Amino acid sequence: TLPANIHNFFRLIKTKVKFMNDPIEKLKSQKNSVEIKGMKSAHLRDGIALTRSIYWIKNKVNTQQLTEIQAVKKIDDNRLKNKKFHSLSFPTIAGSGPNGAIVHYHATKKSNRRIKDTDLFLIDSGGQYLDGTTDVTRTISFKKVSKEQKKMNTLVLKGHIAVATSKFSKSETGKSLNTNARKYLRQHDCDFDHGTGPVSYTHL
């Protein structure tokens, strides 16, 4: 990719620019056998850490007051216990109720909200391990959800299944897959204002 300001500079000095695909990008998009194995291992151990965190959060919500910042600390601490853990993929996001709807929300002392069992609770987090990197999002309900929440979750799930079962050619771009992910929501005049899914990559 060429930054826009550099492209504009070449235009100003009237130099012709030939655009071509970056060969490195193609290599980066194709995982070799070592990367695939590492990715699977990293997701397995990360899943264990996240499952322990969610179990702890569900128990604490029912027995005592728990805040978003406390939940973030527990999630991060459980990842930190693994010997192959290197760092977080990005700062852990934990949003309760309306905070869960804020894209890339991060709890601060001012915004820190008590996690209520009547609200949906969103976790978006990941870890960098020596053999792979994770990025996982989970929406948790502590009690029975409303009809509207159930409907929205079902529409998102249908989009996920549509992408997972798509058959596409080698030359096809992600644009059509993105459309598949959103089509059931759009049928109900709904959408989401962020990317469809995370990037899967190897520990850098």
Where are these regions (language model features)?
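Active-site neighborhoods and metal-handling regions in enzymes and metal-associated proteins
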Residues: T1-L204
